[in-house]
Amino acid sequence: MNLLIHIFKRELLSYFLTPLAYVFIVIFLALIGSFTFYLGNFFVRGQADLNSFFVFHPWVYILLIPAVTMRLWAEERKTGTIELLMTLPLTTTHAVLGKFIASWFFIFVALILTFPIWITVNYLGDPDNGIIFAGYIGSLFMAGAYLSIGSCISAVTKNQVIAFVVSTTVCFLFTMMGVDLVLNFFKLWAPEFLVNTISSMSFLTHF
């Protein structure tokens, strides 16, 4: 457990010692805020809820989370520090979990910084805070799914750009599987069980 905590602290610290963390958080907050209040027509809708906030999370994660995961293992492989890491008295499980939890916690911090939007909704009306809280939990778990994909792809390449592009593509495909336009296309010729299987693989279906 101590080794897992050590990897977690090391990885989390590496985020905040570089501009990456701050750039990610600023872009995330700017995109989410813009999408919620402008594209989501927050004020025009006249409803005290955060539907227009959460609906854009899968699409924002498609680009931003691969930017976080692209360096998890690709950088270690490129610089050769992965050999040093593997010589330490820890298991592969400790290394993988430590890096994953650190990146997941980083996303958690970014989500916490969106709480002013939640406060704004409560100031403007009387929302169902239970649903909003559940939305945050769901978004965090969805982010974990994106992180799993990005981490896996980062582990098989030394090039961070390749890791980013491939992770973005895979996350995009998994998200698009739940879009009505795509599902309607498959309904034209595919059996129902296949359509349901494709739909169940999408992040949109479960969020």
List the model feature ranges, each with a label.
Residues M1-L64, V68-L72:
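Hydrophobic alpha-helical transmembrane segments
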Residues A30-T36, F115-I117, V170-D180:
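Aromatic-anchored segments of alpha-helical transmembrane domains
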Residues F42, Q47, V156, V166-F207:
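Terminal transmembrane helical anchor/hairpin motif
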Residues D49, V68-M86, F100:
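Transmembrane helix boundary and interhelical loop/hinge segments in multi-pass membrane proteins
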Residues T92-T93, Q160:
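Alpha-helix N-cap/start motif
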Residues K99-F100, G135, S167-T168:
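Residue-level recognition of transmembrane alpha-helices
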